Amino acid sequence: MTKIAYLASKATLPGSPTRRSDAFEHDRMMSALRAPFAEHGMQVVDVDWKDGALDWSQFGAAIIGTTWDYWDHHDQFVDTLKRIEQATNLFNTADLVQWNSHKGYLRDLATKGARLIPTLWIDRVDRTDFLSAFERLDSNDLVFKRQVGAGADGQFRLGPMDALPDMPHPMMVQPFLSKIQEEGEYSFIFIDGAFCHALLKTAKSGDYRIQSTYGGTETAIAPPPQDLADAKAVLRTLDDTPLYARVDMLRGQDGRLLLMELELIEPYLYPIEGPGLGAMMADAVRRRIR
Protein backbone atom coordinates (compact mmCIF):
# COMPACT_ATOMS: atom_id res chain seq x y z
CA MET A 1 0.00 0.00 0.00
CA THR A 2 1.05 3.58 -0.60
CA LYS A 3 1.54 5.30 2.73
CA ILE A 4 -0.08 8.72 3.21
CA ALA A 5 1.17 10.84 6.10
CA TYR A 6 -1.49 12.68 8.10
CA LEU A 7 0.37 15.46 9.87
CA ALA A 8 -0.64 15.93 13.48
CA SER A 9 0.86 17.46 16.61
CA LYS A 10 2.05 15.74 19.75
CA ALA A 11 -0.98 17.01 21.65
CA THR A 12 -3.47 15.51 19.18
CA LEU A 13 -1.86 12.09 18.65
CA PRO A 14 -3.29 9.11 20.56
CA GLY A 15 -1.37 8.23 23.71
CA SER A 16 -0.02 11.71 24.34
CA PRO A 17 0.20 12.53 28.07
CA THR A 18 -0.67 16.13 27.22
CA ARG A 19 -3.49 15.39 24.79
CA ARG A 20 -5.82 18.29 23.95
CA SER A 21 -9.45 18.22 25.03
CA ASP A 22 -10.50 18.45 21.36
CA ALA A 23 -8.17 15.66 20.19
CA PHE A 24 -11.23 13.49 19.63
CA GLU A 25 -11.55 15.43 16.38
CA HIS A 26 -8.24 13.92 15.27
CA ASP A 27 -9.63 10.45 15.99
CA ARG A 28 -12.76 11.21 13.99
CA MET A 29 -10.72 12.35 11.00
CA MET A 30 -8.55 9.24 11.08
CA SER A 31 -11.64 7.02 11.31
CA ALA A 32 -13.17 8.83 8.34
CA LEU A 33 -10.07 8.53 6.15
CA ARG A 34 -8.64 5.07 6.81
CA ALA A 35 -11.19 2.82 5.07
CA PRO A 36 -11.81 4.96 1.94
CA PHE A 37 -8.09 5.44 1.41
CA ALA A 38 -7.47 1.70 1.89
CA GLU A 39 -9.99 0.99 -0.89
CA HIS A 40 -7.65 2.90 -3.21
CA GLY A 41 -4.53 1.11 -1.96
CA MET A 42 -3.44 3.87 0.42
CA GLN A 43 -2.65 3.61 4.13
CA VAL A 44 -3.16 6.76 6.21
CA VAL A 45 -0.57 7.08 8.99
CA ASP A 46 -0.79 9.86 11.59
CA VAL A 47 2.59 11.39 12.45
CA ASP A 48 3.96 14.27 14.49
CA TRP A 49 4.98 17.04 12.10
CA LYS A 50 7.93 17.83 14.40
CA ASP A 51 9.36 14.28 14.17
CA GLY A 52 12.78 15.03 12.73
CA ALA A 53 13.59 11.34 12.27
CA LEU A 54 10.90 10.75 9.64
CA ASP A 55 11.93 10.02 6.06
CA TRP A 56 9.22 11.84 4.16
CA SER A 57 10.11 10.12 0.90
CA GLN A 58 8.51 6.90 2.23
CA PHE A 59 5.10 8.53 1.80
CA GLY A 60 3.20 8.93 -1.44
CA ALA A 61 1.78 12.16 -0.05
CA ALA A 62 1.42 14.14 3.14
CA ILE A 63 -1.84 15.79 4.22
CA ILE A 64 -1.77 18.53 6.82
CA GLY A 65 -4.16 17.46 9.55
CA THR A 66 -4.28 18.34 13.23
CA THR A 67 -1.07 20.39 13.46
CA TRP A 68 -2.75 22.47 16.13
CA ASP A 69 0.38 24.08 17.52
CA TYR A 70 1.90 25.42 14.32
CA TRP A 71 1.14 29.06 15.16
CA ASP A 72 3.55 28.87 18.10
CA HIS A 73 6.28 27.47 15.81
CA HIS A 74 5.37 29.21 12.57
CA ASP A 75 8.78 29.43 10.90
CA GLN A 76 9.70 25.87 11.86
CA PHE A 77 6.36 24.68 10.51
CA VAL A 78 6.77 26.37 7.14
CA ASP A 79 10.37 25.14 6.84
CA THR A 80 9.24 21.59 7.63
CA LEU A 81 6.51 21.75 4.99
CA LYS A 82 9.02 22.90 2.40
CA ARG A 83 11.25 19.94 3.24
CA ILE A 84 8.30 17.56 3.00
CA GLU A 85 7.38 19.03 -0.37
CA GLN A 86 10.86 18.29 -1.67
CA ALA A 87 10.38 14.62 -0.79
CA THR A 88 6.73 13.95 -1.65
CA ASN A 89 3.36 15.48 -2.54
CA LEU A 90 2.08 17.91 0.08
CA PHE A 91 -1.53 18.98 0.55
CA ASN A 92 -2.13 21.78 0.80
CA THR A 93 1.05 23.20 -0.72
CA ALA A 94 3.67 25.00 1.36
CA ASP A 95 3.20 28.23 -0.59
CA LEU A 96 -0.55 28.17 0.00
CA VAL A 97 -0.04 27.43 3.69
CA GLN A 98 2.48 30.23 4.12
CA TRP A 99 0.07 32.69 2.53
CA ASN A 100 -2.94 31.44 4.51
CA SER A 101 -1.06 31.38 7.84
CA HIS A 102 -1.16 35.17 8.11
CA LYS A 103 -4.60 36.73 8.36
CA GLY A 104 -3.45 39.35 5.85
CA TYR A 105 -4.66 36.87 3.24
CA LEU A 106 -8.11 38.29 3.92
CA ARG A 107 -6.99 41.62 2.51
CA ASP A 108 -5.85 39.84 -0.64
CA LEU A 109 -9.22 38.15 -0.99
CA ALA A 110 -11.04 41.44 -0.46
CA THR A 111 -9.21 42.96 -3.43
CA LYS A 112 -10.56 40.05 -5.49
CA GLY A 113 -14.14 40.66 -4.46
CA ALA A 114 -14.61 38.57 -1.32
CA ARG A 115 -17.19 40.05 1.08
CA LEU A 116 -15.53 40.53 4.48
CA ILE A 117 -16.38 41.79 7.94
CA PRO A 118 -14.81 45.29 8.32
CA THR A 119 -11.29 44.77 9.68
CA LEU A 120 -8.40 46.80 11.09
CA TRP A 121 -4.81 45.56 11.04
CA ILE A 122 -2.59 46.62 13.96
CA ASP A 123 0.99 45.39 14.42
CA ARG A 124 1.11 46.15 18.16
CA VAL A 125 -2.00 47.30 19.99
CA ASP A 126 -1.34 50.16 22.42
CA ARG A 127 -3.90 52.21 24.35
CA THR A 128 -4.24 54.76 21.55
CA ASP A 129 -4.83 52.08 18.90
CA PHE A 130 -7.21 50.30 21.24
CA LEU A 131 -9.45 53.32 21.80
CA SER A 132 -9.35 54.53 18.20
CA ALA A 133 -10.42 51.10 16.92
CA PHE A 134 -13.88 51.53 18.46
CA GLU A 135 -14.32 54.86 16.70
CA ARG A 136 -12.92 53.67 13.38
CA LEU A 137 -15.18 50.61 13.31
CA ASP A 138 -18.15 52.49 14.80
CA SER A 139 -18.72 49.81 17.42
CA ASN A 140 -18.45 49.47 21.19
CA ASP A 141 -17.98 45.71 20.95
CA LEU A 142 -14.83 44.51 19.17
CA VAL A 143 -13.03 41.21 18.70
CA PHE A 144 -9.21 41.22 18.66
CA LYS A 145 -7.57 38.22 16.97
CA ARG A 146 -3.96 37.21 16.34
CA GLN A 147 -2.92 37.70 12.73
CA VAL A 148 -1.14 34.33 13.00
CA GLY A 149 -3.24 31.94 15.02
CA ALA A 150 -6.30 29.71 15.05
CA GLY A 151 -9.04 28.32 17.23
CA ALA A 152 -9.68 31.55 19.22
CA ASP A 153 -6.20 31.26 20.74
CA GLY A 154 -5.15 34.72 21.97
CA GLN A 155 -8.54 36.19 21.06
CA PHE A 156 -10.32 38.91 23.06
CA ARG A 157 -13.79 40.41 22.94
CA LEU A 158 -13.59 43.90 24.45
CA GLY A 159 -15.41 47.18 24.99
CA PRO A 160 -13.85 50.66 25.22
CA MET A 161 -14.01 50.67 29.04
CA ASP A 162 -12.22 47.33 29.39
CA ALA A 163 -8.62 47.08 30.51
CA LEU A 164 -6.17 46.56 27.67
CA PRO A 165 -4.86 42.98 27.86
CA ASP A 166 -1.36 42.08 26.76
CA MET A 167 -1.35 41.56 23.00
CA PRO A 168 2.28 40.87 22.04
CA HIS A 169 1.37 39.69 18.55
CA PRO A 170 0.11 41.59 15.48
CA MET A 171 -3.67 41.69 15.71
CA MET A 172 -6.71 42.02 13.47
CA VAL A 173 -9.74 43.83 14.88
CA GLN A 174 -13.36 43.36 13.84
CA PRO A 175 -16.72 44.49 15.18
CA PHE A 176 -18.53 41.79 17.08
CA LEU A 177 -21.56 40.76 15.05
CA SER A 178 -24.49 39.58 17.15
CA LYS A 179 -25.41 37.03 14.47
CA ILE A 180 -22.66 34.76 15.84
CA GLN A 181 -24.79 34.32 18.98
CA GLU A 182 -28.23 34.71 17.42
CA GLU A 183 -27.70 32.42 14.43
CA GLY A 184 -24.20 30.93 14.52
CA GLU A 185 -21.30 30.50 12.11
CA TYR A 186 -21.56 28.57 8.85
CA SER A 187 -18.83 26.27 7.56
CA PHE A 188 -18.68 24.96 4.00
CA ILE A 189 -16.25 22.12 3.23
CA PHE A 190 -14.87 21.70 -0.29
CA ILE A 191 -12.68 18.86 -1.55
CA ASP A 192 -10.70 19.48 -4.73
CA GLY A 193 -13.03 22.39 -5.48
CA ALA A 194 -16.24 20.34 -5.14
CA PHE A 195 -18.75 21.04 -2.37
CA CYS A 196 -18.85 18.25 0.20
CA HIS A 197 -21.02 19.39 3.11
CA ALA A 198 -22.00 22.32 5.31
CA LEU A 199 -22.81 22.86 8.94
CA LEU A 200 -23.96 25.47 11.41
CA LYS A 201 -21.76 25.98 14.46
CA THR A 202 -23.30 27.55 17.55
CA ALA A 203 -21.75 28.71 20.82
CA LYS A 204 -22.90 27.58 24.23
CA SER A 205 -25.17 29.95 26.12
CA GLY A 206 -23.34 33.07 27.27
CA ASP A 207 -20.33 32.56 24.97
CA TYR A 208 -19.58 33.57 21.40
CA ARG A 209 -16.77 31.13 20.58
CA ILE A 210 -18.08 28.24 18.52
CA GLN A 211 -15.13 25.83 18.90
CA SER A 212 -15.81 22.52 20.67
CA THR A 213 -13.13 23.40 23.23
CA TYR A 214 -15.44 26.16 24.47
CA GLY A 215 -18.61 24.09 24.38
CA GLY A 216 -19.70 24.86 20.83
CA THR A 217 -21.92 22.44 18.91
CA GLU A 218 -22.34 21.61 15.21
CA THR A 219 -25.38 20.70 13.12
CA ALA A 220 -25.30 19.47 9.52
CA ILE A 221 -27.35 21.64 7.16
CA ALA A 222 -28.46 21.75 3.55
CA PRO A 223 -27.45 25.31 2.64
CA PRO A 224 -29.80 27.53 0.62
CA PRO A 225 -28.59 28.17 -2.96
CA GLN A 226 -27.53 31.77 -2.24
CA ASP A 227 -25.50 30.79 0.83
CA LEU A 228 -23.70 28.06 -1.12
CA ALA A 229 -23.08 30.49 -3.98
CA ASP A 230 -21.52 32.97 -1.53
CA ALA A 231 -19.17 30.25 -0.26
CA LYS A 232 -18.22 29.12 -3.77
CA ALA A 233 -17.47 32.73 -4.71
CA VAL A 234 -14.75 32.78 -2.04
CA LEU A 235 -13.02 29.74 -3.55
CA ARG A 236 -13.11 31.33 -6.99
CA THR A 237 -10.82 34.09 -5.72
CA LEU A 238 -7.96 31.56 -5.43
CA ASP A 239 -5.48 31.07 -8.26
CA ASP A 240 -5.23 27.30 -7.67
CA THR A 241 -7.64 24.69 -6.33
CA PRO A 242 -6.68 23.39 -2.87
CA LEU A 243 -7.17 19.73 -1.98
CA TYR A 244 -9.31 20.78 0.96
CA ALA A 245 -10.85 24.06 2.08
CA ARG A 246 -13.21 25.18 4.78
CA VAL A 247 -15.03 28.46 4.25
CA ASP A 248 -16.27 29.96 7.53
CA MET A 249 -18.96 32.62 7.14
CA LEU A 250 -21.32 34.79 9.17
CA ARG A 251 -24.54 36.41 8.05
CA GLY A 252 -24.34 40.16 7.58
CA GLN A 253 -26.98 42.80 8.12
CA ASP A 254 -28.14 42.51 4.48
CA GLY A 255 -28.85 38.79 4.88
CA ARG A 256 -25.87 37.70 2.75
CA LEU A 257 -22.95 35.73 4.13
CA LEU A 258 -19.65 37.44 4.95
CA LEU A 259 -16.29 35.65 5.00
CA MET A 260 -14.77 35.16 8.44
CA GLU A 261 -11.97 32.75 7.54
CA LEU A 262 -10.82 30.67 4.59
CA GLU A 263 -9.16 27.71 6.29
CA LEU A 264 -6.56 26.04 4.06
CA ILE A 265 -3.97 24.77 6.55
CA GLU A 266 -5.26 22.44 9.26
CA PRO A 267 -9.03 22.88 9.51
CA TYR A 268 -11.18 20.29 11.16
CA LEU A 269 -13.43 19.06 8.34
CA TYR A 270 -16.32 17.69 10.42
CA PRO A 271 -16.57 14.11 9.09
CA ILE A 272 -19.53 13.31 11.36
CA GLU A 273 -21.59 16.00 9.64
CA GLY A 274 -20.22 14.97 6.23
CA PRO A 275 -20.05 11.16 6.04
CA GLY A 276 -18.91 11.32 2.41
CA LEU A 277 -15.78 13.30 3.29
CA GLY A 278 -13.38 10.36 3.45
CA ALA A 279 -14.38 8.97 0.05
CA MET A 280 -14.11 12.40 -1.59
CA MET A 281 -10.65 12.99 -0.12
CA ALA A 282 -9.42 9.52 -1.10
CA ASP A 283 -10.62 10.02 -4.69
CA ALA A 284 -9.00 13.45 -4.87
CA VAL A 285 -5.64 12.29 -3.49
CA ARG A 286 -5.61 9.28 -5.80
CA ARG A 287 -6.14 11.57 -8.80
CA ARG A 288 -3.44 13.97 -7.69
CA ILE A 289 -0.69 11.42 -7.01
CA ARG A 290 -1.48 9.07 -9.89
What are the roles of these predicted feature ranges?
Residues 225-290:
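ATP-dependent carboxylate activation and anion-phosphoryl transfer catalytic cores
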Residues 9-120:
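Conserved N-proximal alpha/beta basic substrate-recognition cap immediately N-terminal to
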Residues 68, 125, 268:
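Flexible, active-site-proximal loop/turn residues at the rims of small-molecule/cofactor binding pockets
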Residues 45, 117-118, 174, 245, ...:
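A short, local hydrophobic-aromatic micro-motif
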Residues 49-53, 147, 175-179, 247-250:
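Short, solvent-exposed loop/turn elements at beta->coil junctions and helix N-caps
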Residues 2-8, 81-87, 94-183, 225-229, ...:
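Active-site nucleotide/adenylate-binding loops and adjacent lid/helix of ATP-dependent enzymes
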Residues 151-239, 258:
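Phosphate-binding site of ATP-dependent enzymes
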Residues 42, 114-115, 138, 238-243:
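Short secondary-structure junctions
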